[in-house]
Amino acid sequence: MEKENNKNRKKKIKIKAGTGSNKTFLLKREFLYKETETLLLTNIVNKKVSTPEKDLNKAQLNVASSNIIKLNEQNKNTNKKILTISKISKTLGGKPVLKNISLNLNHGQILGLLGPNGAGKSTLFNLIVGKIFPDFGEIKLNNEIINDLPIHKRAIKGISLLEQHKGLFGNMTAYENLYAILELHIEDKSKIESKIFQLLSYFGLQYLVNVKANNMSGGEYKKISTLQRICNKDIKVLLLDEPMAALDPLSISSIKKFILELRDMGLSVIITDHNFFAIQDILDNCIIIRDGVVMVEGPPKDIIKDQKAIKYYLGTGFKI
């Protein structure tokens, strides 16, 4: 038995098939804070939840819209810095990946972090969330230095990352995917359901309540994945790694609207992408990095005027 538990710790908790709409959840450890892992490993195999038989009814939607999720009002003060990165450097495998990087993210702001493959965007995200630590420099959240904080403590303080290739449990519905995370933090089932209804209703996604992740469009999948990252804690800074990747134009437009709604909730957002023109219309500020160095910084309306800079730092395929 001990050998089997160790195997699950290294990989993931195996799913136990249920009957009807009841399932025992498969949960990856990456979704959890360190303090909740023991709870998960000892109890999750006995937990079951039923997906609602019908879509949200009118009464539920009214309750949801009267209890719209709102983050702390101070998060909407766009003149105050929430995240400050000062002269960060990082070497990986003997190669300098980031060189003296500095940036500021204000409350309620959307910041674009652009650059070609290998520019250092993902490394910077990993430094912010605490997957790796800087060799030099300083990271502050709300003016508190967090350089030495591990990933789970940074998550508790309100930093969340949605990686490009990480997402939902494909055989589970939107409701089940959100429930699987919320049940680790909320004991009252009715409160969990209320929270899910609020989230889905606020973003107009209630029609996905019974849709399995494998049957969602690319845009729908990314929206529910994002909600999974913000549903169980007071997120202050949301990092989105190429949220437009592999999406059709209609889905890109929908995701951009969704990100603006996240900003309107009070979240501060950093987006990575290769394509300046795909996201420039939703950005408050933009930073272009190349070979681990900040090359261009400023409002999109100023950067878009510099065709030579865009072609040089992002590639000759870009045109104005």
Please give the residue ranges for each predicted region:
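Conserved ABC ATPase "signature" region
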Residues: 190-208
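Catalytic Walker B motif of ABC-type/P-loop ATPase nucleotide-binding domains
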Residues: 238-242
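Conserved ABC ATPase signature
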Residues: 212-216
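Q-loop/switch helix immediately C-terminal to the Walker
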Residues: 165, 172-183
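Conserved ABC transporter NBD signature motif
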Residues: 137-145, 157
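Helix-to-loop junction immediately C-terminal to a conserved catalytic motif
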Residues: 129
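The feature captures the beta-strand-to-loop junction immediately N-terminal to the Walker
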Residues: 114-116
